[in-house]
């Protein structure tokens, strides 16, 4: 299991507010919690940056982290990420912030310590481009956006 460096920026993290952790042995994402001074109400259409109380340094250029919404918050309450998916590069060392967007019709209260997102570590492959005049023919060619059919 790779080791990722973490700096605790909020003394409540690891005490009153749990550290990021996997909820089950099969979980792909670490739960991230709102390290707020007080609960806040996210109005419909409003987006706010929510601190997590920690910074990470992945260090390994073959890894990155993605921040994803929690499915229940999105489905039941319309709370998703304002940037849809957050990307944390291996050389980033600042606080992990979660952009929360209320796309639902009702105000939503985010409590101190509430689970607001999940972080998944993924492998990274950097590529170089080879410029060509034409591509070798493929069955799909330029078809996209539903081109392969509905069923």
From Swiss-Prot:
Question: One GO molecular function term?
Answer: magnesium ion binding
* The UniProt record lists the keyword Hydrolase: yes
Listed binding positions for substrate are 70-72, 83, 87-89
InterPro entries xref list: dUTPase, dUTPase-like, dUTPase-like_sf, dUTPase_trimeric
Tell me which EC number(s) this protein carries: 3.6.1.23
Going by the UniProt record, its keywords in alphabetical order are:
Hydrolase, Magnesium, Metal-binding, Nucleotide metabolism
Q: What's a single GO BP term from this record?
A: dUTP catabolic process
Pathway given in the UniProt record = Pyrimidine metabolism; dUMP biosynthesis; dUMP from dCTP (dUTP route): step 2/2
Q: What cofactor does this protein call for? A: Mg(2+)
The protein's annotated catalytic reaction(s) are:
dUTP + H2O = dUMP + diphosphate + H(+)
Q: Which PANTHER family does its entry note? A: DEOXYURIDINE 5'-TRIPHOSPHATE NUCLEOTIDOHYDROLASE
Q: Relate the protein's function as given in its record.
A: This enzyme is involved in nucleotide metabolism: it produces dUMP, the immediate precursor of thymidine nucleotides and it decreases the intracellular concentration of dUTP so that uracil cannot be incorporated into DNA.
The similarity comment for this entry is: Belongs to the dUTPase family.
Q: Which HAMAP family match?
A: dUTPase_bact (MF_00116)
What's the protein here called? Deoxyuridine 5'-triphosphate nucleotidohydrolase
Organism of provenance: Methylococcus capsulatus (strain ATCC 33009 / NCIMB 11132 / Bath)
């Amino acid at each position: 299991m790779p080791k990722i460096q973490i700096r605790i920026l909020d003394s409540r993290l690891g005490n009153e507010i749990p550290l990021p952790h996997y909820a089950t042995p099969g979980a792909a994402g670490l739960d991230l919690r709102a390290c707020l001074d007080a609960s806040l109400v996210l109005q419909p259409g409003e987006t706010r940056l929510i601190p997590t109380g920690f910074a990470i340094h992945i260090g390994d250029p073959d890894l990155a982290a993605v921040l994803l919404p929690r499915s229940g918050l999105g489905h039941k309450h319309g709370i998703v990420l304002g940037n849809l998916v957050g990307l944390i590069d291996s050389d980033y060392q600042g606080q992990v912030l979660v952009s929360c967007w209320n796309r639902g019709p009702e105000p939503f209260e985010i409590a101190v310590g509430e689970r607001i997102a999940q972080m998944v570590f993924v492998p990274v492959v950097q590529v170089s481009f080879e410029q060509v005049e034409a591509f070798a023919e493929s069955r799909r060619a330029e078809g996209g956006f539903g081109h392969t059919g509905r069923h």
